[in-house]
C-alpha cells in the first residue's frame, strides 16, 4: 500500500529496474486476515506496473473454494505469478502450484520453522505429495471431512499412486461443519464439492468422505442424480465419490458414482478369519454412519444385531431402521453374542 500511495517510491523503483544489471522485482500482496475485498484491484494494479517481473498474491483461505480463485489467477497470468492460500484450507494451492503454472511455492525445513500458516515441510511437499511429479495432467483426489488433518489417507494413497505409476495426488480437504447446524453443514459440503467438480482444470477425480459428511454425500448424490450403490441408499451413508471425466471436455458436466466401502471392508475382515454373517449374533458398538453401514451389511448377510451406543435414542433408531429395511433382528437389549464390533 505504501508503494501504491507514493509516486516518489514508485519512481525510485522504476529507475532502478531500468538499469542493465537490475535484478527482477517481485510485487507482492499478503493478507493474513483473509481474502482481500479489493483483490481484483490489487492484482490489476500490480499487472499494470512494468517494473514487476513476478507477481505474488497470498491470503488466508476461508474455505477450499478460495484455492479455485487462486488457480484461476495462475491460469490468467501475464508473467510469472505466485498465488497461495494460507491456513488450514490452503494446502491445495501450495501442492498444486505446478499443475496451474505457478512460478514457485514455499515449504519449511521443519514444522517448527514455518513462515506462514498452513505451510508444509519440504519432506511433506516433496515426499508425501510428490511435488516434483505434479503437472497439468495430474488428477486430484482427497479426503473430505472435518477435521481431516489427522487422516493417514494422503500418506497411504500417495504411496500407492507412486507404486503403480499413477499421475495423481491425494490431499486433505477440510470442509467445515457444525453439529448444531446440519443444513448449513450440508450447504458447505455441497457448494465445495460441486465447485471443485465444475472447475475446468482441477481434474477432481475422487473423494474419500469421512465424518461428518457421509450422510451429506448421500443427500448430494440424490439431489444430483448420481449413481448410488444399494447399500449407501439403504443406510443413508457413503464414504466414496468416484468422478468420471466428461466425454465432452473439461468444462462439461461430469458424472459421478457414490459407494459405501466401510461395510464391505468389515464383512471381508470377518470372512478373512472364517466368520460369516449368516446366523451370527453380533454386538455392534456405535450408531454413527460407519456403524450403521456395517450393521445393514451384516443384517443383509443374515446376522442378528444388538446395538450399543452412548445415546439410547440413536441406538434405538438404528435398530428400528435395520429391522424395518432388512427384516433382520436388531435391537438394543443386551443378549449373548458371538462377535463384538467396536466402531469408533
What does each of the following model-derived ranges do?
Residues 85, 140-149, 258-263, 270-302, ...:
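Glycine-rich adenosine-cofactor-binding loop
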Residues 4-139:
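Catalytic alpha/beta core domains of metabolic enzymes, predominantly
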Residues 42, 152-163, 289, 293, ...:
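Short, solvent-exposed amphipathic alpha-helices that sit
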Residues 303-326:
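NAD(P)-binding Rossmann-fold cofactor-contacting core
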Residues 138-275:
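Phosphate/diphosphate ligand-binding glycine-rich loop within oxidoreductases
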Residues 26, 56, 82, 142, ...:
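A structural signal for isolated positions on well-ordered beta-strands in alpha/beta enzyme cores
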Residues 31-32, 61-63, 85-91, 110-113, ...:
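Glycine-rich beta-alpha junction loops
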Residues 326-344:
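Short acidic low-complexity segments
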Amino acid at each position: 500500500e505504501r508503494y501504491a500511495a507514493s509516486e516518489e517510491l514508485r519512481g525510485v523503483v522504476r529507475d532502478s529496474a531500468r538499469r542493465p544489471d537490475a535484478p527482477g522485482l517481485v510485487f507482492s500482496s499478503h493478507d493474513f486476515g483473509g481474502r482481500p475485498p479489493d483483490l481484483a484491484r490489487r492484482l490489476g494494479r500490480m499487472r499494470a506496473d512494468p517494473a514487476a517481473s513476478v507477481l505474488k498474491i497470498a491470503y488466508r483461505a476461508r474455505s477450499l473454494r478460495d484455492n479455485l480463485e487462486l488457480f484461476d489467477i495462475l491460469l490468467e497470468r501475464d508473467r510469472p505469478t505466485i498465488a497461495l492460500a494460507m491456513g488450514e484450507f490452503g494446502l491445495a494451492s501450495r501442492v498444486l502450484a505446478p499443475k496451474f503454472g505457478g512460478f514457485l511455492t514455499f515449504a519449511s525445513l521443519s514444522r517448527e520453522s514455518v513462515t506462514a500458516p498452513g505451510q508444509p515441510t519440504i519432506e511433506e511437499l516433496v515426499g508425501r505429495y510428490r511435488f516434483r511429479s505434479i503437472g497439468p495432467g495430474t488428477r486430484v483426489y482427497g479426503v473430505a471431512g472435518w477435521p481431516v488433518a489427522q487422516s493417514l489417507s494422503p500418506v497411504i494413497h500417495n504411496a500407492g499412486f507412486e507404486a503403480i505409476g499413477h499421475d495423481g495426488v491425494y490431499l486433505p480437504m477440510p470442509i467445515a461443519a457444525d453439529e448444531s447446524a446440519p443444513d448449513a453443514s450440508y450447504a458447505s459440503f455441497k457448494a465445495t464439492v460441486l465447485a471443485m467438480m465444475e472447475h475446468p482444470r482441477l481434474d477432481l477425480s475422487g473423494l474419500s468422505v469421512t465424518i461428518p459428511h457421509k450422510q451429506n454425500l448421500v443427500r448430494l448424490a440424490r439431489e444430483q442424480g448420481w449413481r448410488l450403490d444399494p447399500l449407501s441408499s439403504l443406510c443413508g451413508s457413503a464414504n466414496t465419490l468416484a468422478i468420471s471425466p466428461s466425454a465432452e471436455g473439461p468444462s462439461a458436466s461430469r458424472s459421478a458414482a457414490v459407494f459405501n466401502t466401510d461395510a464391505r471392508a468389515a464383512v471381508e475382515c470377518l470372512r478373512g478369519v472364517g466368520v460369516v454373517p449368516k446366523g451370527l449374533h453380533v454386538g455392534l458398538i456405535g450408531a454413527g454412519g460407519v456403524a450403521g453401514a456395517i450393521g445393514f451389511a451384516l443384517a443383509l448377510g443374515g446376522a442378528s444385531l444388538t446395538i450399543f451406543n452412548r445415546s439410547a435414542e440413536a441406538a434405538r433408531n438404528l435398530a428400528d431402521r435395520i429391522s424395518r429395511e432388512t427384516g433382520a433382528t436388531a435391537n438394543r437389549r443386551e443378549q449373548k453374542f458371538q462377535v463384538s464390533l467396536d466402531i469408533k
